[in-house]
Amino acid sequence: MQIDDKLLTKLEKLSALKIADDKRQELEEQLSQIVNFVEKLDELKLDDVEAMTSTTNTATPFRLDESRKSDVIDMVSKHAPNSQDGFFIVPKIIE
């Protein structure tokens, strides 16, 4: 799949991002490389491969579930083009 200017413009609109004109060509190439890589992964024959939940046989220690004060929502919301009460406001894309 090739990422062209038409698709990049659609992605730009859906993501509410502004892509600088001097970065468009580079981004098209990078996205095309990512999509091509994923398409190659899709070609792998994995019918005889058992599903794995981890790549190692060791257990991962759990961290304590402690409540912490975080300003992540405020930080992310101030960079969003449109947000309200900690939520993103996005255009409707499904009819």
From Swiss-Prot:
Keyword Ligase in annotation: yes
Annotated Pfam families: GatC
GO BP field: glutaminyl-tRNAGln biosynthesis via transamidation; regulation of translational fidelity; translation
UniProt GO molecular function: asparaginyl-tRNA synthase (glutamine-hydrolyzing) activity; ATP binding; glutaminyl-tRNA synthase (glutamine-hydrolyzing) activity
Enzyme category, top tier: ligase
Family: Belongs to the GatC family.
Subunit organization: Heterotrimer of A, B and C subunits.
Protein name stated in the entry: Aspartyl/glutamyl-tRNA(Asn/Gln) amidotransferase subunit C
Organism in which the protein naturally occurs: Campylobacter lari (strain RM2100 / D67 / ATCC BAA-1060)
